[in-house]
């Protein structure tokens, strides 16, 4: 499966109305790609936290889910008075990977456990 490019995400958010609002100014493209590949393969994820259409937790999962046409549960979250909405067209999609190899492995293990599948299947999906 091909990776989603920065240009493809920017074109998508520019051409589409995104239901939920971001509260982040930057997101990590490699993280989105790993989640996207897993979602396309049917790997389940926990819900994202939302309050008043603002994403409190789960920005990478949300964008990946839209691109993969994957339904994600929405659970109540909490925002503060300082939390601001960020237009998706203003979000920077960074190509540098924010996760260390150790964190990627830990997340893969969590996903394998959550889905009750061998970690080798998760690792294979990401190749």
Model-inferred region functions:
Residues 2-56, 60-67, 71-73, 78:
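Short alpha-helix boundary/capping and kink motifs at helix termini
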Residues 47-127:
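Basic- and aromatic-enriched surface patches that contact anionic nucleotides/nucleic acids
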């Amino acid at each position: 499966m091909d990776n989603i490019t920065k240009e493809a995400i920017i074109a998508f958010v520019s051409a589409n109305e995104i239901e939920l609002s971001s509260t982040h100014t930057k997101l990590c493209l490699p993280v989105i790609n790993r989640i996207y590949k897993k979602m396309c393969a049917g790997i389940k994820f926990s819900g994202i936290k939302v309050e008043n259409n603002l994403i409190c937790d789960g920005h990478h999962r949300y964008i990946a889910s839209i691109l993969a046409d994957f339904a994600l549960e929405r659970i109540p979250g909490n925002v503060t008075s300082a939390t601001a909405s960020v237009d998706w067209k203003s979000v920077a999609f960074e190509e540098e990977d924010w996760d260390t190899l150790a964190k990627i492995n830990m997340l893969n293990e969590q996903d394998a456990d959550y889905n009750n599948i061998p970690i080798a299947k998760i690792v294979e999906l990401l190749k």
